[in-house]
Amino acid sequence: MPGDCLFCRIAAKELPAKFVFENERIVAFADLHPQAPAHVQLIPRKHIASTLEVGEEDRAIVGELVQTAAGLARELGFADDGFRLVFNTNGAAGQSVYHLHLHLLGGRTFRWPPG
């Protein structure tokens, strides 16, 4: 774990976060600056900087992130209305924390194309 990685520190519970799910491989917590009424970050406990660094050995964890996000959308009550899942990769796409994270956004109507 890189010592300066914000999300590694959250996953290790060195920094506070409102956890909505956790297991031995991933954690999910409420976004500190939500962009929708429901905005959850899902991250692997293993440090992976971005989608560009997802290796063959990481394929299962990416699938688990997506499956867990769908389950949380159901639990939080907005799955039937619809929700958005987003991986941002690198600066021009809006990635500000270089630890793989999946945004789960729901509770409002989204437009296309996104911002």
Residue ranges and their predicted role:
Residues 1-115:
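HIT superfamily nucleotide-processing domains
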